[in-house]
Amino acid sequence: MSAIPEEFLSTQAQVDEQAIQPFPNSRKIHVAGSRPDIRVPMREITLSDTHTSQGREKNPPLTVYDTSGPYTDPEAKIDIRQGLSELRRNWIEERADTEILSDLSSQYGRQRNADSKLDSLRFAHLRPPRRAKAGHNVSQMHYARQGIITPEMEFIAIRENQRLEQYREQLAQHHPGQSFGAHLPSRLTPEFVRSEVARGRAIIPANINHTELEPMIIGRNFLVKINANIGNSAVTSSIAEEVDKMTWAIRWGADTVMDLSTGKNIHETREWIVRNSPVPIGTVPIYQALEKVGGKAEELTWEIFRDTLIEQAEQGVDYFTIHAGVRLAYVPLTAKRLTGIVSRGGSIMAKWCLAHHTESFLYTHFEEICEIMKAYDVSFSLGDGLRPGSLADANDAAQFAELETLGELTEIAWKHDVQTMIEGPGHVPMHLIKENMDKQLACCGEAPFYTLGPLTTDIAPGYDHITSGIGAAMIGWYGTAMLCYVTPKEHLGLPNKNDVKEGIITYKIAAHAADLAKGHPSAQIRDNAMSKARFEFRWEDQFNIGLDPDQAREYHDETLPKDSAKVAHFCSMCGPQFCSMKISQDVREYAKQKGLKHHTALEQGMAEKAQEFREKGAEIYHET
């Protein structure tokens, strides 16, 4: 899509071809729910047969969680100028608690729509916004607390289970894990989803104006999720590039995407992204509000911010990062820090508080913000504006003072049945990570934790996807529900598509490692399938089971490029004579032939190999 000039965007925009290619040996499947319009997408990987001395053994296909939406479905017709189909429209309409507005409620939104100079880059098929009817609350938390299981909740239960019942045999070898108090049922039910949302331990980010959304859940007792950040700046990127980044991010496994645009045409960029996104979209509304006052934080007002919230809610943004915990009294606590306030949103609000010498309007108007959130079912992501920006500042008084305030604000949000998660650090050495998780659980009533890493060392610019991936795996194990990815460009510049992919793969590894360590019931299925394929030298299956089949195949072919190497019973690491797995297979075959038990065969086989070694001259190395 990025090759299209913006003046022709509305008529000529095309989807990124790389983003819509099906994964090798994979197909999109849909698991049916209790009603015809609940069809949960998953990816099924076809596996090759196992070859044994007794013949062939079938390996069942492997089902994996899929965030790519219809983009990787060859049967789907993708036209980003039209947007995705409205999966949730009927579910929302049948609840009969919303109304379609005759016009946008936001003054800024109306101004943008009336500006004919924007016609060429505006998404052409704008829909009138939807809002809760007077006196109604349309949040998934509100429904859950009424005892209602919504179609979204059933969709999520099916999605999280990943057809687990079909893989019980593959889980014969399964580590129970250490969950640190999380409750991970052996099978998720819609009722369990409802109860977790009602309790506030999980959120379903699903704005009523984002009808294209495939429902997902963020919570400690579910699969660990990851978020990918995209967004333009004043110096780089276009609408087309940001849509490409979104489709690219969800291909590789982003569960949500945050649009952090601060450049031109923020409103139009967001519309294109939301209309074409099957995953929840988050934003930091204060960024756009700041642009509306020319970048001068002290000129921000509650009225401008309120209008921005409504503008974005009516476009379909699913969760807002709001830095309402940055209070005037906490700003001096950052004075002796090595790196001060590093959160963009936090620094904006700190500057406003100091300029006006009063509490932040985000804090004083918090209940009014809740009224807006529940009218559209936008979830809170309560921002950590005072997070540490260096190891030296980790776990200090400013960070934890804000966290305690976020806990108080969570209780207020829950009083309004508004879904809420809490953002966390940041830069934290490994031995201080668990304290962050424990304190968040205690302060915030087990609301989902959403962390940026944390980075475990500050010495590796260019490799902060690794320094943070270490911390992400740890804090995910301890109970964090969603991990915000870090790319190799962190602290250095805006990421491109390759950086986005590398950050996502790194964080998919971290999230999956956390699921394994927690003992999530379905997590080890994929690992066991990979291990079996590896032991049986099913190279194509190894590539395809992996998170990045393209790179796995490329690395293999660098040293063994011929097709024959993809059926060889060795790799380039050890070669044909020293492959440990090949030796183990030989021992098993020897045991079958001799009618021996495995350990007896091993002893006898080793004796025969020793005799063979001596007869060949007892030389360690031979010419080949």
From Swiss-Prot:
<feature type="binding site">
    <location>
        <position position="423"/>
    </location>
    <ligand>
        <name>substrate</name>
    </ligand>
</feature>
<feature type="binding site">
    <location>
        <begin position="343"/>
        <end position="345"/>
    </location>
    <ligand>
        <name>substrate</name>
    </ligand>
</feature>
<dbReference type="GO" id="GO:0016830">
    <property type="term" value="F:carbon-carbon lyase activity"/>
</dbReference>
<feature type="binding site">
    <location>
        <position position="229"/>
    </location>
    <ligand>
        <name>substrate</name>
    </ligand>
</feature>
<dbReference type="InterPro" id="IPR038521">
    <property type="entry name" value="ThiC/Bza_core_dom"/>
</dbReference>
<keyword id="KW-0479">Metal-binding</keyword>
<feature type="binding site">
    <location>
        <position position="491"/>
    </location>
    <ligand>
        <name>Zn(2+)</name>
    </ligand>
</feature>
<dbReference type="GO" id="GO:0009229">
    <property type="term" value="P:thiamine diphosphate biosynthetic process"/>
</dbReference>
<dbReference type="GO" id="GO:0005829">
    <property type="term" value="C:cytosol"/>
</dbReference>
<dbReference type="InterPro" id="IPR037509">
    <property type="entry name" value="ThiC"/>
</dbReference>
<keyword id="KW-0004">4Fe-4S</keyword>
<feature type="binding site">
    <location>
        <position position="579"/>
    </location>
    <ligand>
        <name>[4Fe-4S] cluster</name>
    </ligand>
</feature>
<feature type="binding site">
    <location>
        <position position="258"/>
    </location>
    <ligand>
        <name>substrate</name>
    </ligand>
</feature>
<feature type="binding site">
    <location>
        <position position="571"/>
    </location>
    <ligand>
        <name>[4Fe-4S] cluster</name>
    </ligand>
</feature>
<keyword id="KW-0862">Zinc</keyword>
<protein>
    <recommendedName>
        <fullName>Phosphomethylpyrimidine synthase</fullName>
        <ecNumber>4.1.99.17</ecNumber>
    </recommendedName>
</protein>
<feature type="binding site">
    <location>
        <begin position="384"/>
        <end position="387"/>
    </location>
    <ligand>
        <name>substrate</name>
    </ligand>
</feature>
<dbReference type="GO" id="GO:0009228">
    <property type="term" value="P:thiamine biosynthetic process"/>
</dbReference>
<dbReference type="GO" id="GO:0051539">
    <property type="term" value="F:4 iron, 4 sulfur cluster binding"/>
</dbReference>
<comment type="subunit">
    <text>Homodimer.</text>
</comment>
<feature type="binding site">
    <location>
        <position position="574"/>
    </location>
    <ligand>
        <name>[4Fe-4S] cluster</name>
    </ligand>
</feature>
<keyword id="KW-0949">S-adenosyl-L-methionine</keyword>
<feature type="binding site">
    <location>
        <position position="427"/>
    </location>
    <ligand>
        <name>Zn(2+)</name>
    </ligand>
</feature>
<dbReference type="InterPro" id="IPR002817">
    <property type="entry name" value="ThiC/BzaA/B"/>
</dbReference>
<dbReference type="InterPro" id="IPR025747">
    <property type="entry name" value="ThiC-associated_dom"/>
</dbReference>
<keyword id="KW-0784">Thiamine biosynthesis</keyword>
<dbReference type="Pfam" id="PF01964">
    <property type="entry name" value="ThiC_Rad_SAM"/>
</dbReference>
<feature type="region of interest" description="Disordered">
    <location>
        <begin position="48"/>
        <end position="70"/>
    </location>
</feature>
<feature type="binding site">
    <location>
        <position position="450"/>
    </location>
    <ligand>
        <name>substrate</name>
    </ligand>
</feature>
<comment type="pathway">
    <text>Cofactor biosynthesis; thiamine diphosphate biosynthesis.</text>
</comment>
<keyword id="KW-0456">Lyase</keyword>
<comment type="similarity">
    <text>Belongs to the ThiC family.</text>
</comment>
<feature type="binding site">
    <location>
        <position position="287"/>
    </location>
    <ligand>
        <name>substrate</name>
    </ligand>
</feature>
<keyword id="KW-0411">Iron-sulfur</keyword>
<keyword id="KW-0408">Iron</keyword>
<dbReference type="Pfam" id="PF13667">
    <property type="entry name" value="ThiC-associated"/>
</dbReference>
<feature type="binding site">
    <location>
        <position position="323"/>
    </location>
    <ligand>
        <name>substrate</name>
    </ligand>
</feature>
<comment type="function">
    <text>Catalyzes the synthesis of the hydroxymethylpyrimidine phosphate (HMP-P) moiety of thiamine from aminoimidazole ribotide (AIR) in a radical S-adenosyl-L-methionine (SAM)-dependent reaction.</text>
</comment>
<dbReference type="GO" id="GO:0008270">
    <property type="term" value="F:zinc ion binding"/>
</dbReference>
